[in-house]
Curated annotation (Swiss-Prot):
PROSITE patterns: HTH_LYSR (PS50931). GO terms for molecular function: DNA-binding transcription factor activity; transcription cis-regulatory region binding. The gene is yahB. Gene3D superfamilies: 3.40.190.290, Winged helix-like DNA-binding domain superfamily/Winged helix DNA-binding domain. PANTHER family: HTH-TYPE TRANSCRIPTIONAL REGULATOR (PTHR30126), LYSR FAMILY TRANSCRIPTIONAL REGULATOR (PTHR30126:SF18). Belongs to the LysR transcriptional regulatory family. This is Uncharacterized HTH-type transcriptional regulator YahB. Keywords: DNA-binding, Transcription, Transcription regulation. Signal peptide: none annotated. InterPro entries: LysR_subst-bd, Tscrpt_reg_HTH_LysR, WH-like_DNA-bd_sf, WH_DNA-bd_sf. Pfam families: HTH_1, LysR_substrate. The lineage of its organism: Bacteria, Pseudomonadati, Pseudomonadota, Gammaproteobacteria, Enterobacterales. It comes from Escherichia coli (strain K12).
Length: 310
């Protein structure tokens, strides 16, 4: 019974079903027609069903045969997928890589480009992408929810087992709607004026380590939103104030949706790190690390988001 489900048997059966002919299946597989016919007959005997109705000129799947064809095709696909995975693993290519991207560096365009180059380079690797805010990125890699973190914030944490290297920095701009009252206040704007308006904030997504607050004045109201795109839209509508990544502000300013203003004690650049598990030595991880070096492919993809020192 077990011999029925060999690769050779399943391939003979599915090929015969696709061509509707034992002779054409034999020609396709480089076998004799009698060998194909014998294999199918042995499978029918083992399964105790008729897989094909036969005529002098053609064969046709029975209802049981159609069901078995679907399952046999799935089994062959699984077999070939497993074989490809084993081959790649033996070459040091990870079967699966989980990437956590800091929301400051997450855009659909950049993430799609990242996946495009990774799948071109490593087509058999299963890639999962998630996004977190601030220390939520560290949380993901420390708790083994991610193998690689793109944009871990510049915070040194205890725990060990993590390698990291700088990939650039996010530069911040204080941005408000053109008709916001603060747009008409002399610069640099005093903190006493800033406190009068709510700060639109994206909450840190860390669960097991301390959450980080990006920028908030003492006594200032805060409005929490889930992501920086929502924060940007809220500030465009004049619902609050705050710092945004400069790349996001530049785009909004081209449409006259935001203006920038100078304030006392502006927010400093946020250094971004590429962090990996120390034990992650596979080819995908090493390739990503290499391509975030100067002139690397991934450095080029993220160059409009990150500032790098020359």
């Amino acid at each position: 019974m077990n011999s029925i489900f060999t690769e050779e048997n399943l391939l003979a059966f599915t090929t015969a079903a696709r061509f509707g002919s034992f002779s054409k299946a034999a020609e396709e597989l480089g076998l004799t027609t009698s060998a194909i016919s014998y294999t199918i007959k042995r499978m029918e005997t083992g399964l105790d069903v008729v897989l094909f109705t036969r005529s002098t000129r053609s064969i046709e799947l029975t209802e049981s045969g159609r069901y078995f064809f679907r399952k046999a095709t799935d089994l062959l696909n699984d077999f070939y997928a497993i074989k490809r995975r084993i081959d790649t693993i033996s070459q040091g290519i990870e079967a699966r890589v989980r990437i956590c991207i800091n929301q400051l560096l997450y855009t659909p365009k950049h993430t799609a480009r990242l996946l495009q180059v990774l799948k071109k380079q490593f087509p058999t690797c299963q890639i999962t992408v998630t996004t977190e805010v601030y220390n939520g990125v560290w949380d993901a890699i420390i708790n083994n929810q991610a193998n690689i973190a793109i944009g871990a914030p510049d915070t040194l944490l205890d725990g060990g087992g993590i390698d990291y290297t700088e990939i650039g920095a996010i530069r911040w701009a204080f941005a408000i709607a053109p008709d916001h009252p603060l747009a008409f206040v002399p610069e640099p704007i005093a903190e006493s004026q800033l406190r009068l308006y709510p700060n639109i904030m994206v909450e840190d997504t860390a669960h097991t380590i301390n959450k980080k607050v990006g920028w908030l004045l003492h006594g200032q109201e805060s409005i929490l939103v889930p992501d920086f795109n929502t924060k940007c839209q809220c500030q465009i509508l004049g619902e609050g104030i705050g710092f945004l990544p400069d790349y996001m502000v530049r785009e909004a300013m081209t449409q006259s949706l935001l203006v920038t203003r100078q304030i006392h004690n502006p927010r400093q650049d946020s250094r971004m790190l590429l962090a990996t598990q120390h034990s992650a030595t596979g080819q995908v991880t090493q390739w990503i690390k290499k391509q975030f070096a100067p002139n690397g492919i991934l450095t080029g993809i993220y160059q409009d988001l990150l500032h790098r020192e020359n």
